[in-house]
């Protein structure tokens, strides 16, 4: 990491002074913000809120998204406590949870929404986010109670947590007659909100894929 920082510094120094100054000011500002966030974690939340608002998300959705971030953090903390390795093992368990509640792996889910490198959770509806949170929060709680030791036991725990949310999804769909999982991504969901505000579509959201 230190070597990378030195390379960045050398690259900046190689830029003519008058051209490098704006970039140096930007780096200083970013550094200041990170220090402030370390001192006051609430600033991280405030800045995340501001970023999502600028992207056109509703406050209701943003509240759920920020909560989802916290739920995910609690889950990964629990995985760390159980000796789960970051990277491949995290990805495997995440896929098990996703498959158990949505019927798809993370990659399949992203393909459905036409995503490549974009964050899947940033492209979920409020209900999708809530069910994903339920799956992850339940997995965390089951893990705390059962204290899995082996990776195989962690896989079973992930499947159990995901199944709880999967059952909830099926119950919701049975009551509404509408699939919870949608192919709409963030851009399409934002356009629906704009259309509703401008009166182009009915607030009830009659689109079969909504």
Residue positions per predicted region:
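Positively charged, phosphate-engaging catalytic surfaces used for nucleic-acid and nucleotide handling
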Residues: 12-210
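Short, small-residue-biased leader/transition segments that mark boundaries at the very start
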Residues: 3-8
